Amino acid sequence: ADRTEVFMRSEFMVKRETPVSHTVCHEVVKVHARAIARRTFREPIVRKSIGAEVTGMTACPCAQNIMKERAMRVLQGLNVDKHSIDAFFTEVPMATHNQRGKGFLCIETDDDQHVDLSKIISILKDSMSAGIYELLKRGDEGHVVLAAHKNPRFVEDCVRQMAKKVLSEFEYLSGDSVVTIKQTNEESIHQHDAYAERTATIAELVDEMNGENRNADE
């Protein structure tokens, strides 16, 4: 055969602690790996990939802004001064609707390059509004909800964050390494779900990020 492929799917148990009570719990992360070898006249060409799917929580920025505008009108009507209103919104983010987010990240590289699975999992978790846990005490629950509402993100925001974090964590990878990013947010107030994805080489992502930085400076 001129081409050989091996593919693996598995479930990876991650030990975690809740943010306030430090209760130990576990999370199941879906992981997969693939290797493809092609025969050549010299050494075989091997490409490999590793990826994971992680579940988290997102909070909608749009609905939150609507609720903030409403709350601001009420506070102004009660003659609350602007400084106090700003301080209130800093400490107490407004209500919004939430989604259960499913992030997917896969990186394909040459055989001689290493991609740390734990970094992939961390990138996925950190790219959503907040992480979720199997077991939460009351203090933990309040912390998670507050963290999510202080960090609202659209589905496309999650994909952008993953791309930026990949470049930060895996800056040593060759430019032809291929990054596949997907995010699905299961909507709570819509009949549909929100979805975004991006597939690009490391070199393409670097060019895109440099373009964003140039535009921000102008």
What are these regions (language model features)?
Residues 1-218:
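N-terminal intrinsically disordered, cationic/polar leader segments
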